[in-house]
């Protein structure tokens, strides 16, 4: 059984942390023995420790931190690590540099952001590529971007994120969301759950809601769940546009299933996204989706899937018209609900993700 060290700079509560936790929950003590090292602690550390995973905090000051590379190499020797699985560029470079001090370890990197690198980083990627054992892109465009960023494509596998269908099943009547907010059962509820940061597109989403009020008389409520640096700014925007009766802020919530089950539609307004766990979870809970046409979203929402609509980023008119379709066409809403459940079962089921990732570990260790 392989000893796998998951390495993460910040062990918080976002999608990448969910990815790591999912792999650990399904692989630990079955296919691998899991270990975890991190720079800045957070909720993920607590969750992994509850699962009995050994954890260690190490300093990761920059992507070229040789001291961190030596520390990581020693930690891998102490724990007899076979493979280090990294999630972001900083810890990825450090893990590749650590191979200089510990020849045994192999490195797998999962790309969670679809962003072009600058010329210096592309050059560095090409230099380090010979040390790279395997890469995982969570969407089709992710693989294309990795190659454009200087990594060779022969060791890049596309593995979609996956969720447990049973975990998100259940009747809508289970939800207490509408009761909590004082909303009638026939109110159309849209949900967006994400961190309030610039790349999540809340400002554009709020402008879309303002435009929607001009297009329809059907009552609706937009529910926003999450926290982050732009939360207060977004609340002020809602007040400035006079949308206090249309938009509700919940803050950070752990009862995400309760929110899905109390909603009619999931909305993703991100500018950057690899392959959103939240979109897939919402679909597994039976929600159709509106998502921006960026990065991995077209792998989820497309004509074949029939689970929702793609819209242009930062185009409030496009978003408003898409929402109006679901508001005023109940048959279309029902059809997309069916498409959402079918698509998750066919393409985004957790066991496929986990099994394919375990195969990548074996490919890496065989090099």
Feature roles, as predicted:
Residues 14-25, 188-211, 222, 229-235, ...:
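A conserved mid-protein helix/loop that constitutes part of the nucleotide-sugar donor-binding site
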Residues 37-38, 288-291, 301:
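Short hydrophobic beta-strand element within catalytic cores of glycosyltransferases
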Residues 86-92, 111:
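Short His-centered aromatic/hydrophobic patch
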Residues 108-136, 149:
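A conserved, positively charged/aromatic
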Residues 179, 318, 325, 332-347, ...:
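A short, well-ordered alpha-helix in the C-terminal region of glycosyltransferases
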Residues 252, 271:
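Aromatic "clamp/platform" in nucleotide-sugar-dependent glycosyltransferases that forms part
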Residues 303-304, 308-316, 325-330:
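Conserved acidic donor-binding segment of nucleotide-sugar-dependent glycosyltransferases
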